[in-house]
Every structure is written in structure tokens, then in C-alpha cells.
Amino acid sequence: MWDNPRLLNGAAGFLVGLTVLACTLAAGNWLLRSSLFPVRVVEVSTPLEHVSRQDLRAVLAHYAAGNFFAARIDELRAAAEQVPWVRRASVRRVWPDRLEVAIEEHVAFARWGSEGLVNTQGERFAAPSGAALPLFIGPPGSEAEITRRYARFVETLAPLGSPLERVVLSARHGWQLRLANGLQITLGRDVDAADDRLTRFVEAYARSGNVRADVVDLRYPNGFAVRTRG
């Protein structure tokens, strides 16, 4: 072996590579454990409208303490997303001693039963809110569908001049609407067919003058039933 230059060169290269790897691992371990690189600043880079800065600071302080290189970025992000009104959070290291946090807040679109809110993406979330919002009621998992349908209902009902304040989707997939003026509209389960019926009803109701209805049933294929106010 000792008189074989090729083997000697190969062995030397292997030893050099092993030494470099060991040094790299040692340096990495030192960087992770060293107190020379503390996180000094945790900065929220986005303006906040609903998120409590106090709650967010408490989360960030707990997960961001310690070494710049060892900061638990994924855990910090996941914890920040548990703070009320936070939809998404992203965290990045900024050399030499800063963590930058970007927050995307939920935008409340409706109330969901008595349990929470629905955002503009049709996602349910829990957060306090005193805003005047429409009420959605439906089976778990139907939030996005109700949000999508709500926009169509609002457009169709606009000529009536009364806001749509409640949308109910039953467990059997039956739809029911209520306007701010008290008018209740039953669409039934075939909501696609009911779209045309709702349009026809709105046109007829707008022409009816002084007639004021309490309840409208649109489940009939060739017409609708109306209960008027006495």
C-alpha cells in the first residue's frame, strides 16, 4: 500500500474529507449552542388590526428565546397561528440577531352560529368580535359553500333593498334565508334550480307594490307560496 501512490492519495483524500466533516459538525454544534449569537430583536413586520400585540409578544418571547441559529422557527410560526385573528404567520431569520414575523389576519365575513366567525375565504375561526355581521348556520365543513352562495344570494336579492342577515343550511342540505326586514325565504335542497325561482320571485315582489310578505316558499317548480303580513 505504502508504495502505491493512487491508494495513498485516496486515503489522504478520505482523511481530509473526514476531518472537514468533523470540523463542520463541530462548528455547527458550537453555533447552535453558543451564547455569542442571541436573538435580540423579534419584529412583527406587518400592521395589526385585530391581533393582540400583547398575546403575540408572549408567544414570540417564549419560542424565540435563545440562540439565533437554534431558534425554533416552525414551532414559533405554529404557535403564532394559534393567537386569535391570526390566519397565517411566517418567520424568517435576519442576520445577525433578528427574527422577522409576518402576520396575515383573518377578515371576518360572517358569524358562525354561536361558536365563532367565518372569514372571506370561507374558513371558520374563533375570535371575539362585536361587528354587525350576517349569521351563517350549517353543518361542520359547509362554511366555504355558504360563503360562496351568500354572495350570489346578496346579488339576486339586492332589488328588495333589505340586507341578507341570515343563511341557514340544514343537515339535509335545505337552504333558508332571512332578510333584515324579517322576510324569510325557503329555497329547499335544489339550490341551483332555486336560483332561477329566487330571481323570478324578486322580480314579482318588486312589482307587488304594497304587498309585504313574512314567509316565501320557493320549493315549488312552477311558482311559490307567500304568507303575507296581516
Q: Predicted segments — roles?
A:
Residues 82-87, 156-163, 209-211:
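Short secondary-structure junctions
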Residues 42, 89, 136, 167, ...:
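Generic beta-strand hydrophobic packing signal
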Residues 45, 92, 168-170, 219:
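Solvent-exposed beta-strand sheet faces enriched in polar/charged residues
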Residues 54, 58, 74, 78, ...:
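Solvent-exposed, polar/charged alpha-helical surfaces in well-ordered, non-transmembrane soluble domains
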Residues 1-38, 49-50, 54, 64, ...:
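N-terminal positively charged amphipathic segments used for targeting/anchoring
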